[in-house]
């Protein structure tokens, strides 16, 4: 990588750091409104990174070099690492929170990757500025995820994401990285914000206080899962709140390009026609029905309560949101394991969810069906079709390799945690929560991830970033072939 491209990467990263420093202003306003000391912490963070980012951006502004695909991979990884560190900074320097660096980093990574796992035992005791800040991390991270999924990964050809690029409208079709980022970010910000506002209004109408509604609204549409209470959604003990949370978890797992088309063209036909969405909703319905039957069958709730609690928690875990009912840790172990497995499914590509994504599972299902048909008729000329489009060998190889790497890293992290002395259920649940960006632990991590040792926390930070970036952008940087001219 020559000097000129180091300058262009530094220029872009400097701009992103400068821009992200502005995100410290809203929590400063909240701290000022509630007369909290955290105002000074956010102000210090703002000044430091405003200067660092602005300086790096300004001193490299005359680079005049066009971004390459290789630069795109580097910037993607740097984007999430830098944002994670900046997000952790105010949590780390505030002496009243008494968080170690790794605890602050874990919280920052969890927030910006929309994982929602926390190391804080008593979330309810946090100052309001921090409660808002954590939800804001989810919201900003969610937008970054959507831009990454819709504008960048298809262009880079990662994990079959390019399959739906030809279906994208207007600003989503451009093959130039810089223009895609600018135009797509602007378009998606509007769509994303509208869904967030709708969620806040629905929470408020369901009886949630305004501050809680704002925080939960922006963390729900980002599928981040940070809450203002240690008991999460269970704190409110309100069926309407759970229905709102479950519904918006599902809606936020839709491909956001579809939401853009629906809003711009004022028609829901794209939602009805989309095969990935239909497959996702079919899977969601199955998970909800199975979960409802299991908790009703053992007599935890009546039929009505079983459906509502199951609808909420199944929707939350399937879409990797991570909001929870107060007593979910007391649910049958086999039910929780079933929901943890469903978290690997995730939602649609182009959404804020984590996991492997429904489109990839649909492609793998179609490929398996194709192999059975080909074995039955060896001489037949058959192809794999998804949504009326032929899946190319390039896309198929990408999906299979992504599935293999995702499984490999999951097994690796589980074995490492298990080797550290954590029981298998805790290890599996912790890794599922982190690599799927779902955030809900079980076993020893059911109430907080603070019980993990420091090495385990660092590993789970890596797992969260790997899951969020869909593996390839991270591991490609360790390839010698990548760095060759």
Please describe what each predicted stretch is.
Residues 1-485:
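Membrane-proximal intracellular helices of multi-pass ion channels
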């Amino acid at each position: 990588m020559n000097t000129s491209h180091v300058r262009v990467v530094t220029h872009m990263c400097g701009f992103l750091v400068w821009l992200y420093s502005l995100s410290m202003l809203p929590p400063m306003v909240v701290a000022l409104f509630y007369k909290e000391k955290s105002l000074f912490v956010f102000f210090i963070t703002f000044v430091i990174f405003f200067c660092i980012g602005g300086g790096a951006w300004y001193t490299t502004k005359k680079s005049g070099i066009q971004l390459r695909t290789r630069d795109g991979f580097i910037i993607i990884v740097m984007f999430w690492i830098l944002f994670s560190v900046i997000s952790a900074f105010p949590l780390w320097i505030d002496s009243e929170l008494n968080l170690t660096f790794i605890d602050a980093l874990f919280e920052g990574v969890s927030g910006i990757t929309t994982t929602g796992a926390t190391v804080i035992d008593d979330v309810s005791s946090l100052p309001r500025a921090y409660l808002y800040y954590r939800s804001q991390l989810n919201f900003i991270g969610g937008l970054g995820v959507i831009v990454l999924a819709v504008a960048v990964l298809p262009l880079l050809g990662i994990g079959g994401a390019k399959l739906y690029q030809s279906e994208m409208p207007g600003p989503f079709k451009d093959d130039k990285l810089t223009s895609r980022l600018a135009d797509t970010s602007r378009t998606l910000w509007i769509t994303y914000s509208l869904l967030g506002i709708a969620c806040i209004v629905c929470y408020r109408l369901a009886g949630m206080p305004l501050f809680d509604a704002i925080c939960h609204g922006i963390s729900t549409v980002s599928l981040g899962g940070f809450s203002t209470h240690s008991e999460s959604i269970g704190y409110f003990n309100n069926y309407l709140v759970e229905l709102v949370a479950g519904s918006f978890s599902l809606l936020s797992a839709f491909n956001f390009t579809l939401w853009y088309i629906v809003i711009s063209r004022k028609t829901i036909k794209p939602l009805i026609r989309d095969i990935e969405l239909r497959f996702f909703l079919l899977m969601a319905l199955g998970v909800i029905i199975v979960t409802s039957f299991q908790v009703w069958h053992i007599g935890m709730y009546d039929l009505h309560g079983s459906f509502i609690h199951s609808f909420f928690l199944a929707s939350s875990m399937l879409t990797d949101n991570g909001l929870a009912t107060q007593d979910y840790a007391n649910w049958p172990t086999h039910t929780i394991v079933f929901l943890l497995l469903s978290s690997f499914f995730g939602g649609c590509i182009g959404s804020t969810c984590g996991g492997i994504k429904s489109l990839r599972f649909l492609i793998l299902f179609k490929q398996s069906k194709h192999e059975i048909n080909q074995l039955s008729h060896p001489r037949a000329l058959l192809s794999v079709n998804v949504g009326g489009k032929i899946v190319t060998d390039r896309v198929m190889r990408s999906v299979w390799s992504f599935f293999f790497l995702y499984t490999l890293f999951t097994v690796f992290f589980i074995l490492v945690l298990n080797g550290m002395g954590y029981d298998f259920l805790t290890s599996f649940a912790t890794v599922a929560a982190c690599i799927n960006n779902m955030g809900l632990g079980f076993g020893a991590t059911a109430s907080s991830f603070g019980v993990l040792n420091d090495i385990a926390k660092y590993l789970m930070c890596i797992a969260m970033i790997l899951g969020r970036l869909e593996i390839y952008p991270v591991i490609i940087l360790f390839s010698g072939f990548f760095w060759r001219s």
